[in-house]
């Protein structure tokens, strides 16, 4: 059967598939035609993102249906740098009066506006 894949640029790609084809196969066919790696592709049908392990028939995709192709966001940070960033940003003390960020072993606030308060708390940890 024939299905259509529409990109965000408005370009429509025609693919020859079977209902038993899984989503990974469809993404591989898109890669063959357009050169977009499957790990960067997200396919949407009827407002739902299609999961790799499922088949076209699981989503009730019929002949001449239109799928929408969007690309994953690029960027991010290397995993080893995430750990370093969390440590750098979280190992601080916070003044409860003026909310100043202080070094981890601080006993008193360094700001004059709170009277160099000793009312400090540890900075809350970031969630994953």
UniProtKB/Swiss-Prot annotation:
The keyword Ribonucleoprotein applies. GO terms for cellular component: cytoplasm; nucleus; ribonucleoprotein complex; ribosome. There is a cross-link at residue 48 (Glycyl lysine isopeptide (Lys-Gly) (interchain with G-Cter in ubiquitin)). Keywords: Cytoplasm, Isopeptide bond, Nucleus, Ribonucleoprotein, Ribosomal protein, Ubl conjugation. Residues 1-76 form the Ubiquitin-like domain. There is a cross-link at residue 76 (Glycyl lysine isopeptide (Gly-Lys) (interchain with K-? in acceptor proteins)). One of its GO terms (molecular function) is ubiquitin protein ligase binding. InterPro entries: Ribosomal_eL40_dom, Ribosomal_eL40_sf, Ribosomal_zn-bd, Ubiquitin-like_dom, Ubiquitin-like_domsf, Ubiquitin_CS, Ubiquitin_dom, Ubiquitin_ubiquitin-like. Ubiquitin is synthesized as a polyubiquitin precursor with exact head to tail repeats. Some ubiquitin genes contain a single copy of ubiquitin fused to a ribosomal protein. In D.discoideum there are 9 genes: ubqA: 5 copies of Ub and a final Asn; ubqB: 1 copy of Ub and ribosomal protein eL40; ubqC: 1 copy of Ub and ribosomal protein eS31; ubqD: 3 copies of Ub and a final Leu; ubqF: 7 copies of Ub and a final Asn; ubqG: 5 copies of Ub and a final Leu; ubqH: 5 copies of Ub and a final Asn; ubqI: 4 copies of Ub and a final Asn; ubqJ: 4 copies of Ub and a final Asn. This is Ubiquitin-ribosomal protein eL40 fusion protein. The gene is ubqB.
């Amino acid at each position: 059967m024939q299905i259509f894949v529409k990109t965000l640029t408005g370009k429509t790609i025609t693919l020859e598939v079977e209902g038993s084809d899984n989503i990974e196969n469809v993404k591989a066919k898109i890669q063959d035609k357009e050169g977009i790696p499957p790990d960067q592709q997200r396919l949407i049908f009827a407002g739902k993102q299609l999961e790799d392990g499922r088949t076209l028939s699981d989503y009730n995709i019929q002949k001449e249906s239109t799928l929408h192709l969007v690309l994953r966001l690029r960027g991010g940070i290397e995993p080893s740098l995430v750990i370093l960033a969390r440590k750098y940003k979280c190992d601080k003390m916070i003044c409860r009066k003026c909310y100043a960020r202080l070094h981890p072993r601080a006993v008193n606030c360094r700001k004059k506006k709170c009277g160099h308060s000793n009312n400090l708390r540890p900075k809350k940890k970031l969630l994953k």
